[in-house]
């Protein structure tokens, strides 16, 4: 089984108004932890979409118009991801997506590759989230009085990192920083059972 560890950066939280600005992913063997492939790019957007940016989102991720206008077109990004997933065998029952917040990442990912195309390519429809994994693991420990409840420590990615005594995510928030931090937290919480 392979995991597609994925993160996106956007110019706001509303997928009806805002657009994906950056995507990063790593394709990882979930038994060994071996990284098979990685992909990261800034996604160009038209000036009209940029002008609708939420300023708080841009403050967090630090993107500027100069960076965005030089990005790869959404069509180019889509084709590169399709080619990479085909090469790596990202298919239903053989892979899952893993994110910090898949309800957010999935809807913006679908701006690049729509749900019908994903279905046609037999891509996984399971998008797993780190927070739920952490929640389940810490609830089990809390039942045995070996851990505080997850709502006492928090379940943001930085809170999960702190729980495992890991550093917080590098700033500014960029997609590959998010993927690297997600993998670090995933390994601490869940692990790779056959990692050498």
Please give the residue ranges for each predicted region.
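Acidic, Mg2+-coordinating catalytic module of metal-dependent nucleases/exonucleases
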Residues: 96-103, 107-112, 145-196
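Conserved non-catalytic scaffold segment of RNase H-like nuclease domains
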Residues: 1-103, 162-167, 173
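Amphipathic alpha-helical interface surfaces
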Residues: 77-81, 105-108, 112, 126-130, ...
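Short, flexible loop segments at boundaries between secondary-structure elements
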Residues: 123-142
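Short, surface-exposed amphipathic charged segments that create phosphate/polyanion-binding patches used
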Residues: 55-58, 137-145
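A short alpha->loop->secondary-structure connector
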Residues: 114-124
